[in-house]
Amino acid sequence: MERGGYRGGRGDGRGRGGRGYGGGGGGGEQGRDRGYGGGEQGRGRGSERGGGNRGQGRGEQQDFRSQSQRGPPPGHGGRGTTQFQQPRPQVAPQPSQAPASYAGSVGGVAGRGAWGRKPQVPSDSASPSTSTTVVSEPVRVAEVMNLKPSVQVATSDRKEPMKRPDRGGVVAVRRVNLYVNHYKVNFNPESVIRHYDVEIKGEIPTKKVSRFELAMVRDKVFTDNPDEFPLAMTAYDGQKNIFSAVELPTGSYKVEYPKTEEMRGRSYTFTIKQVNVLKLGDLKEYMTGRSSFNPRDVLQGMDVVMKEHPSKCMITVGKSFFTRETEPDEDFRFGVIAAKGYRHTLKPTAQGLSLCLDYSVLAFRKAMSVIEYLKLYFNWSDMRQFRRRDVEEELIGLKVTVNHRKNKQKLTIVGLSMQNTKDIKFDLIDQEGNEPPRKTSIVEYFRIKYGRHIVHKDIPCLDLGKNGRQNFVPMEFCDLVEGQIYPKDNLDKDSALWLKKLSLVNPQQRQRNIDKMIKARNGPSGGEIIGNFGLKVDTNMTPVEGRVLKAPSLKLAERGRVVREEPNPRQNNQWNLMKKGVTRGSIVKHWAVLDFTASERFNKMPNDFVDNLIDRCWRLGMQMEAPIVYKTSRMETLSNGNAIEELLRSVIDEASRKHGGARPTLVLCAMSRKDDGYKTLKWIAETKLGLVTQCFLTGPATKGGDQYRANLALKMNAKVGGSNVELMDTFSFFKKEDEVMFIGADVNHPAARDKMSPSIVAVVGTLNWPEANRYAARVIAQPHRKEEIQGFGDACLELVKAHVQATGKRPNKIVIFRDGVSDAQFDMVLNVELLDVKLTFEKNGYNPKITVIVAQKRHQTRFFPATNNDGSDKGNVPSGTVVDTKVIHPYEYDFYLCSHHGGIGTSKPTHYYTLWDELGFTSDQVQKLIFEMCFTFTRCTKPVSLVPPVYYADMVAFRGRMYHEASSREKNFKQPRGASTSAASLASSLSSLTIEDKAIFKLHAELENVMFFV
């Protein structure tokens, strides 16, 4: 393949995305009667969306199913019967289908000049792939934003990630022996996995069936018909898909559960049909390079098989599994434990199919009686210490089962009864209709119905109802369900430190933990299921050779003259500024101090702090004069956006009066504690007023001494246009006449439970060459959880213009670093985002050479030194270690680089993936470029773990999220007096602000080309 040109697209329409096989399913239970005592409930409409993987995750090969959607173990609900109904014809085995491309099914044609013909703007009709690329996108949002349509590419013109141009890198100052947490998976390429679609319907076909019922019905069919449906030969994703090593009968089955004292009679229809035959040979063809089609459906089917056994033996959280067995030191003693677990993925690699498994730790609430949990959690000696508000805050939203009935259905706590248990009465209705309703009490009902005497009568009941229907159950009859995560932010200081210690284990301990898990009976290689599918896991870690790259020479300053600094590998490539200064110190004459700690009793800003900071700035090479404005305020001011804006405007006005209209170059803000008002201050300063601010906490500043002030000075110097560190020999790959620009892009998505907030795009670009260490930033809001960057070409063009304005030269070469995309989204980056950039540039008569590199941090790959001599002083791999053999893609252009030194825990390498290269890098050249760039990060004196354009883009995207939260909070606070200001109301407000108001994210013109974000 000739570098710099696209490889020809496939004519068969096969894209690179993953097929989503999921469908319906999910859903809760809804009480038909008032349901006191946790009585039988009817099926409610499900809130969980089914569906297979749509490539929304980051990092490794995406898991096929959401483990959180797997049904719980079936409860007892009567013996039941299964009847076969009207067999349907079996679907003849089909060849493995090409999965629909992530962004490739949108149709259209390619653009003229960029790579073909003019782009086709989507019509008003919905594209079949809309749900693949837009998640929960309200139509009104797109209309209000008037968003630029996505560029579309004809299937025959689609481009794929480039192949590696050589056999990998060879340059190294030394070589080290490593182990990597990849385990080879052997399989028979002649084997097939049969994929079946499952549909389970209740008595009312339009109502969704809960996950509990899905698992219960599936298990019932299989256990009643073991010869036709062998459990050990099948794997179920808990929703719509069954994968089988043998052929299964197809058709519809009637599953009936007779009426019992606890449950009404129920019936279901279980329909199964074959949809595909997955050939493992297709995966072999792909890994050997004989086919460029990635059979993601085969990988996803194998992934479900690998997860089947641990899903039955362990606590499942998302795509991770955690042990039920804990050690004494993992119990926090207040109803919360730390559980060890793992997450694994299947990856095609150069050595074959690999199972990548990594260790993790999560805090869980213990599966125990609600009463005992409350006693432990609040440290009560008895329930007379009951405090309603505290209990509601802790319990609402948690799931429980009831222990007075055999049915172990999971129910959600929605609140507490207003009355205590002894005072609750209700109308008891005779289900047979023989007697009129009569008034009874909860206490009497449980004594007569279940023979249970209520002990704790002077506390409320739990309300387990749904859809406004109350379902009161005494707390002592409720048990917390296992696997409920306890937020680490809620842990006390000692518990948080202990959880961190368990999580950030040293490399040797992490390696032992991983080895133990891969070999465990309940691990991915345990059980008989994977063997029945012809899969076998080699339980020995993969040995691999790493190459350590030479650190670049750095340019610093000493007493006004340039000096060369050689980072010392024995000091983990770090350097210090004890007797040296920054490369180019800025001149700061007009600046201000805002002291929010003046009225604080503790953590006041020391009287000499500003003088000491000025002294440290001078020693670093900055010319820092005394502040022209010094104002004091209170921390309470930060809770009011109007007060913050008024205060900042007063700073501008005073500076202007004193120095002939000059605006303050910088505002130093002292705070005594962390406060949400920090977000509001940044939002107002950076979008409304155009002020550069530097905030700091007085406590750490006092304790940190001169080192803290030096770090603060580095940030300040970068923010006001200075240069902290540069490469002495610049970037050797490029020619003298080249003008090069680096661009970084990232998308910050809202939290999982936030269903409305926009996603925030950040695009940054360099403003100088060859130093390439000053960046401009742009912040853009786009529809909720949309990963594809809309208007990426316009953002890049705007940054190119900023580069031209700063240097007077237009870049002839651009390297784009994209963060936050998974392997399944490479198609989107290449055929939507890159094409948008090329078309936008071309319209402006601009055709630079472009290289696109993806940086992935959300993966599970870890490296471990084979001996002490192969590692650093902390037992991690040395800074500058690169791996581009065995565990990388069989032939695509990727590598792992651990550029930083891991001082705590186990170093996580960054996975770099070159998708497109018009600049013609060799493996050695691109690895050297990225490693050297990691030394130019402006905030510290050591190489960072992530290439700076991506690092900065991540910081800017997070800043955009802060803008959204701050503006939402201000919107809530401006409600009329008497409006709700509860926590729930505030949370709702934070989610309700859509992206109609683009001014929220629009940077002030004064800051568009300033590194305000560092």
Curated annotation (Swiss-Prot):
Domain Piwi, residue spans: 666-965
Region (Disordered): 1-137
Annotated GO CC locations: cytosol; nucleus; ribonucleoprotein complex
Low complexity bias spans: 83-104, 121-137
PANTHER family named among the record's database cross-references: EUKARYOTIC TRANSLATION INITIATION FACTOR 2C (PTHR22891)
Assembly, per entry: Interacts with NERD.
BP-aspect Gene Ontology terms: defense response to bacterium; defense response to virus; regulation of translation; regulatory ncRNA-mediated gene silencing
One Pfam short name: ArgoN
Keyword terms, alphabetized: Plant defense, Repressor, Ribonucleoprotein, RNA-binding, RNA-mediated gene silencing, Transcription, Transcription regulation, Translation regulation
Function: Involved in RNA-mediated post-transcriptional gene silencing (PTGS). Main component of the RNA-induced silencing complex (RISC) that binds to a short guide RNA such as microRNA (miRNA) or small interfering RNA (siRNA). RISC uses the mature miRNA or siRNA as a guide for slicer-directed cleavage of homologous mRNAs to repress gene expression. Associates mainly with siRNAs of 21 nucleotide in length and preferentially recruits small RNAs with a 5' terminal adenosine. Probably involved in antiviral RNA silencing. Associates with siRNA derived from cucumber mosaic virus (CMV).
Domain PAZ: 369-482
GO molecular function, one term: mRNA binding
Region of interest called Interaction with guide RNA, as start-end residue ranges on this chain: 857-858, 900-908, 937-959
The protein's name in its UniProt record: Protein argonaute 2
Comp. bias (Gly residues): 18-29, 49-58, 105-114
Basic and acidic residues biased stretches: 1-15
Stated family: Belongs to the argonaute family. Ago subfamily.
Organism expressing this protein natively: Arabidopsis thaliana
